[in-house]
Amino acid sequence: MQYGYFDLKNKEYVIDRPDTPAPWVNYLGSPEYGAMISNNAAGYSFVKSGANGRISRFRFNSMMALPGRYIYLRDNETKDYWSATWQPVGKPLDSYKSVCRHGTAYTVISADYAGISSEVTYYVPIGATYEVWRAVITNNSDKPRNLSTFGFVEFTNDNNYEQDQVNLQYTLFITRTSFEGNKILQHINENDGKDATGSNHRERFFGMVGAPISGYNGNLDSFIGPYRTYSNPIAVEQGKCTGEMNYNSNACGALQSDITLQPGESKELIFVLGQKDNAQANEILASYEAAGKVDNEVEALKEYWHSKLNHFQVSTPSDAFNNMINVWNAYQCFITFIWSRAASFGSGTRRRKDPLYAVCTGRQRRRSAAGQVRPQRRS
């Protein structure tokens, strides 16, 4: 069974069947901000440490990978809804088409369903400590379409992955969310360790530019609904976020926008996720109102990685071997090196020679990130 192929020219792996045997994952980010994303947009994000800097949830070894970076679409005339990636809604593949292009530190997932096409580009800009999801939604039908879009992320309640998952007597009581302008803000331990600006540097935000926000949720249970899953959130099914915020429960960021597309018309929505305070988030979101910013950042990302990979090239009679050595093996080595090979959990310590051998041909002039300290249990 074939699920995809290598695009040698663009240095991408193309997945043209979304029902892969397991999630096929790409890396996004830098030493300061990292993210993992599957071909169906599952995955998580972290600041500096996958163990102690987690800002969005991911459940390992679950029934396929959940949750992730989801954008839901709803036709308000038919009340039918789907997601801009095959999962989590999971429409039948005889009517839903999806293609994922995993590139060098970016992923593009396109979909086509019910006369509406979408293309979502996920990436972390060079030098930035936040991530961007740019969604372009197009009406390919011959009539106007009234749609609602829902961008969704499930926040962790603690930076520490283990604490967030198991120490519920603590983590459920230290977080709240609020809606400010065009974003959801999450506040963690808000009375702990504030600096002169009033920030404890543990605020997260999920914002959107490109269209007015018509609804929002900061409480996970109110967005998903009782006895439901990511595949059928009550807010999406009913076509309306309730505006409920989180206090002493599980947090999320959900932003709704209602749009009307004429035949052939497209709409661009830009979602941004990161660990920033309100003022920083406002500045970041305002910068994405500039036309062409996303295209310029993605092009800069490609140029950066492609030039790095071109430092060392092999040539053999096998194009497949050349591609693996020149692109994907090298890219894997670089990313895991700068994350100390500990994106998920652990101390981040490894033997010294193998990571150095892995990146020396690419002239990587960076010291590996400091070893992460294993978390201590808090009461």
Language model features with spans:
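Anionic coordination/interaction segments
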Residues: 1-364, 373-379
